[in-house]
Structure formats: C-alpha cells, structure tokens
C-alpha cells in the first residue's frame, strides 16, 4: 500500500484503551456483505497490473457498480513506471446522484502490490501479495456502500473512485512533488478530473480498513493540510461510539492516494490502519505490530473482519446523511 514514517522507538504513550466496546451496527450498512465482496476480490488472486487477476477484478467492480449506482465510467491509460515498464491501468468512477452540484469524494485503491517486499521470509519477497486488507477491504467497503446508498440515498452526490496502480513500486517523491513509481491512479485522476470545476466538499481515502484489530489514528499529512475534514470524520466516529477505533491522536505521515489530491487543493484525508498486525495492549500511534502483515504474503482473508468494515462503513454513510 504505501510508506510510513515510523518512529525508531516503540511509542506507548499511556494509551491503554478498552480494546473493544463494539455493541453492534449503528446503521443499516452491512459489514458482512462488505466482507463477502472483499472475499470476491481475494478469490481473483493477486491483482497487480499485468497479472490475470487484475482485469478480472476490474471487470467485476465495473459490473457490480453498474447494478448499484447511477453511472459508471473508466479512465484507461498506459503508465510508464520509473524503470520504464509499461502498465495498462484502469480507474473506475461510480457516481450516486451525478446531477448534484454538492459532492463528496470517496477513494480507495483496488490493485495489489506485485511483490511481498516486507515479508520476513526472503523466499517470499518477490511474490505478489493477495492484499485482503491492502486492496480488497476498500473494494468490499465501496460495493457495500453502493448497496446502502441505493436503498438510502445520501443528502449529497457521492463519487466512489477506485484507483489503480497505487501499490506498484517505490513511494519516493520527486522534486516536483510527483510520485514516479506509485500512486499512479490517484495522480492520473487528479490531473484528469471529471470537469474543470470539479471540487468536492471534502474527500476521504479509505485504505487498509479491514484489519480485525482496527486502530485508526489521524494521519499527519491530513491533519496538517485538511484539518477540518479530519475533525468532521473523527467527530462523526465519536458520535457513533467508535472513538476507541478512530483514535483522536495524530499518527504517522503516510504517502498514500490522498497526496495527489492535496497537491491540487482538493481536501482528501487518509483513513487507514497502518499498524496491520497484532499490537500490544498499551500502544500508541508509533507502535509497531508484533507481527507485520503489511506488504507480506500474510495479508490474507483471515486477517480482516466484518466488524471492522461495519465500523468504517457506519462512519462513511453517516458523513453524507
């Protein structure tokens, strides 16, 4: 998925929270359905560009969103990577109430990383990951959001954007503020907006939100550059009783798909659980998991849960009621 600026030392910060106060869904959003949709993505296998599962997964997303939303369009282009590889990529935009002038943008990436470069087993490092959390969880969430909005229309127009090529290679930024080897889909969309005057009220990137041990801190770039959106999202979560999952502490600065939008002045924040793996009970925003699943072959379906998708889905639908 992305890169994080982890602190060198494990931070505990006295954050010994009650780990689980989940008392059931707060809306009719269906977390179990979101999990099933994520499983459908995982069943296609690794979904990195150029692999058989890539187009199968994209075709499935397009077909499912056409059943549920008012319009579906694609952006297709050939991307040249930092090493000169040519990738055939696809962004998918599903719109609810497309005629509404007031709009909210939700973003997730649907591709998976082509190599498990953080796997501790050196024999696994060149293998593509399944991306149950880092890829499929966001897709599952968005298809279930489309289910919800079809039955309960939002108060504004909602754009559900599935971006491709997020997780291809290095997350290094160049002197112009561009990312030559990753974040391809979000950069392409930010440079090819649906219209010249496209300016959503706010945007939220949902990434790695299926972790069964859900702990979402406020991403540092989002806090610095779109604090009003961070406040809106975390206040909504608190009102739903989810303040021990959406933790009101500033976490790490993450290179992710919100960055190209922020560069263009579109206030998109990053909602993600970067600490993917078991955490000690007394943890903080810089605590490393005891076992890391991120960018490894351990990012498998058994690591994500309907409960986590329910929590995030409840927040997402409440934001646009």
What do these predicted ranges mean?
Residues 11-14:
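C-terminal motif of bacterial Sec signal peptides marking the signal peptidase cleavage site
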Residues 16-18:
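Bacterial signal peptide processing site
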Residues 20-58, 68, 285-303:
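N-terminal capping segment at the start of a domain
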Residues 22-28, 43-53, 79-82, 124-136, ...:
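Second-shell loop/turn segments in exported
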Residues 40-99:
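A non-catalytic alpha/beta surface segment that caps or lines the substrate-entry region
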Residues 48-49, 78-80, 98-100, 110-114, ...:
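Solvent-exposed loop/turn segments at secondary-structure junctions
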Residues 126-228:
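Acidic/histidine-rich catalytic neighborhood of metal-dependent amide-processing enzymes
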């Amino acid at each position: 998925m992305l890169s994080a600026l982890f602190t060198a030392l494990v931070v505990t910060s006295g954050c010994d929270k009650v780990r689980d106060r989940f008392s059931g869904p707060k809306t009719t959003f269906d977390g179990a359905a979101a999990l099933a949709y994520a499983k459908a993505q995982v069943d296609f296998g690794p979904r990195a560009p150029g692999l058989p599962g890539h187009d199968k997964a994209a075709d499935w997303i397009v077909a499912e969103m056409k059943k549920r939303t008012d319009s579906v369009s694609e952006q297709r282009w050939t991307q040249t990577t930092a090493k000169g590889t040519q990738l055939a990529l696809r962004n998918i935009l599903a719109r609810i109430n497309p005629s509404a002038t007031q709009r909210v943008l939700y973003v997730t990436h649907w591709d998976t990383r082509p190599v498990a470069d953080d796997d501790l087993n050196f024999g696994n490092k060149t293998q593509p990951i399944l991306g149950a959390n880092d890829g499929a969880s966001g897709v599952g969430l968005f298809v279930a959001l489309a289910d919800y909005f079809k039955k309960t229309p939002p108060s504004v127009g909602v754009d559900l954007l599935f971006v491709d090529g997020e997780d291809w290679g290095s997350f290094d930024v160049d002197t112009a503020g561009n990312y030559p080897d990753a974040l391809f889909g979000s950069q392409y969309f930010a440079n090819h907006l649906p219209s010249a005057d496209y300016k959503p009220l706010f945007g939220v990137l949902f990434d790695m939100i299926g972790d069964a041990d859900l702990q979402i801190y406020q991403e540092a770039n989002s806090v610095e550059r779109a604090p009003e959106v961070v406040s809106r999202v975390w206040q909504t979560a608190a009102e739903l009783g989810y303040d021990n999952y959406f933790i009101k502490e500033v976490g790490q600065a993450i290179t992710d798909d919100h960055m190209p939008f922020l560069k263009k002045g579109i206030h998109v924040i990053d909602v993600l659980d970067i600490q993917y793996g078991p955490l000690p009970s007394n943890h903080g925003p810089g605590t490393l998991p005891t076992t890391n699943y991120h960018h490894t072959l351990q990012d498998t379906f058994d690591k994500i849960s309907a409960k986590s998708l329910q929590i995030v889905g409840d927040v997402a639908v409440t934001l646009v009621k």
